[in-house]
């Protein structure tokens, strides 16, 4: 990251590193004007923290950021909808820090927003496996925001669903079927109201997905 930003202040880096015995694996996406010598940088880092870099085998698998992901970062959702305010022109990825806790607000003893997100993802899997929405791809995720009155959930404020799809779909029809077959059916305790904001693929096109577009480790993601 440091070297990429030194060479190109506008660089984008999403890289995972795994170390096991005498092997170092570096994988991910880098978009940078300069060519980075990853093995050399890894050896320098190993030496800096007190290891002999000659004892390690280094394997790097780096490619450019997915064009679908880049499309959401290059230009924000608001900008794509015509908002020219300076503070909304730059897009952003969907990185976040997630935490959880036990609670009595659901049968699963999990926070209701997480329960709804799990249900949506489960229904996405079912719709893909059963072929109910044939345009679906295997990659996807969901996030739900619930408004509370004290400790009591009151209404669903926002639902975000990013799901891989085949190219050339009818977006409006696709979104409506997702809402009726997946999203609405997952939210039972609190119904979606007219003020609930539902965002489906807010970054735009999501044709490139899975390992072809993203790099990740089990239980750990940038």
Q: Could you tell me what each predicted segment is?
A:
Residues 1, 42, 183:
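Generic structural marker for isolated residues within well-ordered, non-membrane alpha-helices
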Residues 1-14, 20, 107, 130:
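N-terminal, positively charged regions that mediate nucleic acid binding
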Residues 10-70:
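Conserved beta-ketoacyl condensing-enzyme motif
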């Amino acid at each position: 990251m440091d070297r990429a930003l030194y060479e190109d202040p506008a660089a984008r880096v999403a890289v995972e590193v795994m170390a096991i015995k005498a092997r170092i694996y570096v994988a991910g996406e880098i978009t940078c004007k300069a060519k980075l010598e990853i093995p050399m940088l890894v050896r320098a880092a190993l030496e800096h923290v007190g290891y002999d870099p000659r004892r390690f085998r280094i394997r790097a698998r780096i490619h450019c950021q997915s064009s679908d992901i880049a499309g959401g970062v290059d230009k924000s959702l608001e900008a794509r909808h015509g908002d020219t305010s300076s503070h909304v022109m730059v897009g952003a990825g969907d990185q976040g820090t997630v935490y959880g806790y036990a609670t009595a607000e659901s049968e699963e003893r999990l926070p209701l927003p997480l329960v709804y997100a799990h249900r949506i993802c489960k229904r996405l899997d079912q719709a893909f496996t059963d072929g109910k929405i044939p345009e679906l791809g295997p990659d996807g995720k969901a996030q739900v925001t619930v408004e509370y009155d004290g400790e009591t959930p009151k209404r669903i404020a926002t639902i975000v669903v990013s799901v891989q799809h085949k190219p050339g779909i009818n977006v409006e029809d696709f979104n409506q079927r997702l809402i009726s077959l997946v999203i609405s059916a997952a939210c039972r305790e609190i119904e979606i109201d007219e003020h609930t904001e539902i965002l489906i693929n807010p970054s735009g096109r999501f044709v490139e997905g899975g390992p072809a577009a993203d790099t990740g480790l089990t239980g750990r993601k940038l």
